[in-house]
Every structure is written in structure tokens, then in C-alpha cells.
């Protein structure tokens, strides 16, 4: 096999050469790998890194797509049997065997730099074996971690069974029980003044809480992703507290903070602002329990945004506001709508904290979930079924509308 000194390769490609390194390209199927043999003179740190890169390429050669560009150096190439793309270990062994098949010795070239020869000299202290072996181990570990190829029938069976027991059957049971109620009774109970006011309070407070969380959740996610400061990890962990905290404990905490016994509540009452047992307390409770959804939805998407896109916009003369609205915000908008929709859904179904911080009086701050609970306490199962069905249908319509907005935002 004919080999070319790295000086000649460097001169032909216009790149700095690495003294003491010879490369001989070998075509494996549709890809070509440059194998390295090193002189005993030793290499520097940069040369060793280059050597490891070439050795790693030998292990990854089997994954080149058919018809890929080969790394030939206009020298005669030895044709080896094509390896199966699912056998990276065999390809790595061929590369390593070629790189260490014969010891390398120092032979001075025309310009006085040492080159590798195959005349049986002393072997080099540095070879491509560790890098290629490491790559082979990684490929083998990845192959062992592959999930089993389950049959589509098994996958669909498990998925549909889970969805049926966890989602479809409960909703179907509620709708089936609501269908047993006569239509005139259903309409009368669904349009009672108490029920209509409860719908209004529930959806208005949920929308306000979702809008506030949309703004401040976006800002907090931006700060956690873009800035480094003391206590960042503590703040990031504190965002998840509403997930782990029981809703009754959350209601008790809010009632204590905004009540008469805490300085915040005393200050607000001195200013004429009453929080506990009002709609404002309902909104604050909804904000508290639904706040993490916007932050956790926005963080992964913000981390994927490349800083180079903003720098490119700045280099073209765009202002910071123009860069934010035209470059940063469009890819974040679908995730922002998703987080806002999740926050709205969570606020809509909140019960445990609101039942503590609100007065639960009709025509004041009574919400639909609490009204359903009051109907169940009075053994009014028809009223609870009707109000629950109306709440379910309205929520479904609003979620479908949010999904359509997400599709428009992606376009």
C-alpha cells in the first residue's frame, strides 16, 4: 500500500502538516478512513488530538450513508469487503488492525523531518487503539441500550388500554350519566343563576391567572436560562414547590400570608385591599398552583435557541427589540401558548386551596368546582352531574381553540 507523508498532504491541501504522521486512506464500502501510524519521536498535544479524531473516524465509518464522500488523497486505495452498517465493532477492528499491523520506525524524509516506515523498527508509544476501542465500546453500549422492537399490535393495545381506563371511560361515564337527565331539567339546572355566576367567576379568574403566569412565567424562565447568579439553583428548585405541595397546605399558607396575622395582609388591609375571602384571593390561589407550568414549558425551548441567531441579527443592524420580536419570540410562541393553556387548565380545576382562601358564597366568589362539591354534600347528584358536564364541555372547547392558536403560531 502506498503511503504519503503528512508534509506532502499538507502542501497539497494548503494545511499545516503534522511531522511524523503518515496517512493511508482505505475505502470501506462507500466511506474512506485515514489510518494513522506514528513515529517514535512522539507528538505534541495538538497532534495527539488530531490522531484521536482520525482513529474515532475509523470506528464510525460504518455509519456513513451510501454514496457518501470519501476521504481519498488521490492515492491507490485498498478495497476491503463492505461491512454491514449494524457492525461498527468489525469496522473498528479493521481500522485498528491496519493502524497497528506493523511497527513504525523513524525514517528521515527529504526535508529532514521524521516519517513512518514499515521496516520493522521500534513501535510508537502512541497509537490509535485507545480511541478506536473507546468508540467501539460506546457503540456496543448504545446497541445494548436499544429498546426492543415491539409489534405495532402490542404497542397500540397497551396505549389504547391505558387511555381507555384513565381518560375515556371516566369521561364517558359522566356523559352517560348526564344523558339520563331529561333535557328540560338539564337546561334548567345548567342555567340557574347560581351556576351561571359560578361559571363566570371560574373562567374569568382562570383567564386572569393564566395571563399573569404567561408574562411572569416567561420572564422567570428567561432569567433562569440566560443569567447566572447566586441562588439560581435554589430558585429553580423552588419553582416546583406548587407541584409537590398539597393544595390544602397551599390554601392555608396563602390564607396566613394575606390574612390579618401577617404583615403583608395587614399592610394590604391598611391600603383598603382585602385578599382573603374575595375573588382576588381566588386569583392568587390559581396563580400559585399553576405558575410552574409556564416556566417548565418555556425553559427547554429557550435553551435550544442559539445565541448566534441573535448576534447575526445584531450584526445586520437590528435593534434588541426587533431581534426579540422577529428572531427570539417566533420559536418561543408555541411553547408559550402551551404553557399558558396548561396553566389555565390547572387553574380551572383547582379546588383545595380555593376552598380555604375564598368565602364560598354564591354570587360572590363561589367557583364551579366548589359548587359541585356543595351539591354532592347535599346529595344533589343531578345538579353535580349537570354542572360538571357543562364545565367539561366548555373546557374542551377552549382547549381546542388553544390548539388551533398553537398551529397558527407554528406556521
Swiss-Prot record:
Gene Ontology cellular component terms for the protein in this record: chloroplast membrane; plasma membrane
Transmembrane segments: 153-173, 205-225, 237-257, 275-295, 324-344, 353-373, 382-402
Residue stretch of the organelle transit peptide: 1-54
Family matches, as InterPro entries: CysT_permease (IPR011865), MetI-like (IPR000515), MetI-like_sf (IPR035906), Sulph_transpt2 (IPR005667)
Chief localisation class: plastid
Induction of expression: Up-regulated by sulfate deprivation, but not by other environmental stresses.
CDD domains cross-referenced by the UniProt entry: TM_PBP2
Stretches for region Disordered: 68-91, 103-123
Coiled coil: none
Function, in words: Part of the ABC-type chloroplast envelope-localized sulfate transporter. Required for primary uptake and assimilation of sulfate and chloroplast protein biosynthesis.
Protein name: Sulfate permease 1, chloroplastic
Underlying gene: SULP1
